[in-house]
Amino acid sequence: FHPNYSENGYFYVNYTEHNPRRNVIARYSVDPDNPNEADYFSSEIILEVNQPYTNHNGGQMGFGSDGYLYISFGDGGSAGDPQNNGQNLSTLLGSIIRIDIDNPSGNLNYSIPLDNPFIDTQNAREEIYAYGLRNVWRFSWDIETGFLWAADVGQNAWEEIDIIYPGLNYGWNEMEASYCYPPGSNCNPDDFELPVWEYELYVDDVCSVTGGYVYRGNDIWSLKGKYIYGDWCTGDIWAFTLSEDGNHINEDIIRSNINITSFGIDENDELFFCGNGRVFKLQSNEGDLNGDNLLNVLDVILLVNLILAQGYNDIGDLNNDNILNVLDIILLVNMILGD
């Protein structure tokens, strides 16, 4: 949806066409007579990108806080990137692009932001924001730090999580995650921006990463500030903590057994995910100390009794400081009040 959707009614879609096979980025308008329907005849093509193969045609679109539209494109498909699109700045394949759709320029239905990293770079598409990506399956911004997080689906060995910076090369198809590709080949990792996290394919049946969000909601205190993402095959959902010293932490949250296709957030920054034709919300059982599926004064009474018993019980240690005290009571009351 356009940042000013409430005023202009614009929304954008990314779909595939054939003859020739291509990705189409198009703008539609809401039906002026029905706010729950699109005006089918309002379609305006913004951008088309030819696709040489039948896979890696999806991705992500989203508006940044700068008002520009970011779009990810896969490497064109097949296996191993046979056209070397990931390392080719003259194609939009294998990249995340950044365009201004509010100020069309020349014969384009968009313009190039003047601070895009490859402005005036010879033989480079100036739309490109970052490249060397295989098949980004969902990206999102952390609303507090502004970091752009992306999940890039691997080839045969590794799935990766990246933080995207303008102008950087993320390695594909010379690297798969932090490893030279194909295995046994020579590469220089110093030439590329490496993932902040990676996990191995087919271990415990995982196979394809689905990117999520850094959680900034209030319902699940233990997930605050952590990047929540999943795997399509197993439905595993993890919480990743980025550490300045490099000692990152990846925690298992749940194996949902859902083929997770996407994550989303609502107006309160609470987290949802979808798959198997359904939408699910991540909800907390933190604070439900008595296990009755309710957060209420009975949980406070139980916590007070645990504290008065002068022992330690990790059930009541809501702030994880290895002490049961009034700070846990304050946190529990805030959970109940929704603060």
Where do the protein language model's features map onto the residues?
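Hydrophobic/aromatic beta-strand positions that recur at structurally equivalent sites within the blades
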Residues: 28-30, 99, 161-164, 175, ...
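Short, conserved, GDST-rich strand-edge loop motifs in beta-rich repeat architectures
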Residues: 72-90, 158-160
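Repeated scaffold domains used in trafficking and secretory/extracellular systems
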Residues: 259-262
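Repeat-solenoid scaffold signature
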Residues: 122-160
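Blade-edge beta-strand/turn elements of extracellular beta-propeller
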Residues: 28-52, 91-135, 186-204, 242-256
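Mobile, glycine-enriched helix-loop/loop "lid" segments at the mouths of ligand-binding/catalytic clefts
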Residues: 103-105, 164-191
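Acidic, Gly/Ser/Thr-rich repeat motifs that build Ca2+-stabilized beta-propeller blades
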Residues: 1-80, 138-154, 205-244, 269-272, ...
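Alpha-helical segments with a strong preference for the paired helices of cellulosomal dockerin domains
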Residues: 289-312, 321-339
